[in-house]
Amino acid sequence: FGDIIKPNVKSYSGLELSKHGCDYSSKHYNLKVFNETLENHAKRKIKYDVVIMADVIEHFSDPFTIIEFINEILNEDGLLIFTTFNIDSFYAKITGRNYHWILPFHLFYFSNKTLRSICFERNLEIFKISNDTRTVSVYYLLEKLEKIFPKLKLIFLAIKKIKIFNNLNINVNLFDLNIYYARKISKKHNDD
């Protein structure tokens, strides 16, 4: 991700908890990546115009404090752009307990309404929400479908044995994954 964004900005840095991930990013892509938590990074007092979190907020044990740390490191009118799934989406509702994003390592589940409230209480305003279309392998999609429709597992297993599907990618949008755009509420705006 850093390799894609770096040519389009004046400066870029990333956070990665994996030492291997940091070393790899530095060695292969010449990226500035800190091997530390957001809490420790906030102590550096570095300010950013934009913070991007891709599919990570649901993994934090305390996403509320994480958003507070992000607010601390954002410049005035800075942007937080993040992705996560909407537990209140139509697709999540119709699949119920078989919803494929209900996983042990997802510690929190958010609706658009709760995310707006959580951000606003921490001086960030979500001003745009858009659907996030993903490109996935057919094999990966079939794995997910097996979990959603367990009674059709044998059909999905048979399709997975067709070799052409192992390397075929498709775009998928179940209208449950969203990109959220939030702006730090400026002090001037708060004084009005």
What do these predicted regions represent?
Residues D23, Y99, I170-N171:
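Short secondary-structure boundary/capping segments
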